[in-house]
Amino acid sequence: GIKGITDGEFRRATWHLDFMWGFNGVEHKKTENGVTFHGEQALIDDTWLSGEISVDSHPFVEHYKFVKALEDENTVAKQTIPAPAQFFQQFIIPANIETTRKFYSTDEELINDIANGYKKVIKDLYDAGCRNIQFDDCTWGVLVAEGSVNRYGEDADFKSISEKLLKVNNLAIEGKP
């Protein structure tokens, strides 16, 4: 089988938010309250939109190049990133939706900008030699987990949310290199 190598995500403060912080229009600060994760408060940075989403040069491309330099005839470097659905979910949760709506009046607009940002990062990773990108996606488990109403709000339409999660994931890889 393939002997994949990664950086073990050791450069990241969190497995998913650091990737988001590499995009224009995304801000973060040390949390005051944290988020509940398996009954405990996780003190991860609060992350929200401060403008429309775009990306110039994402720092994860440089992370990948570091790992790529360690390849040999028995190994292949791969890059892990949070799925586009994870990115989308972050900005539609009740804690963020009001701020998100300052920049995106519809989920469709948000989905398109996220997908376009991912396409750029995927292309840049490809140009750096990456042929193995892994999307880490916890959104589906969160969607069906006990407490999902707390995550998405009491008026959440879970069928619609699941369709949007699927759409943003598929759009991001449409036309992949």
Predicted regions and their residues:
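Domain-level signal for soluble alpha/beta catalytic cores
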Residues: 1-177
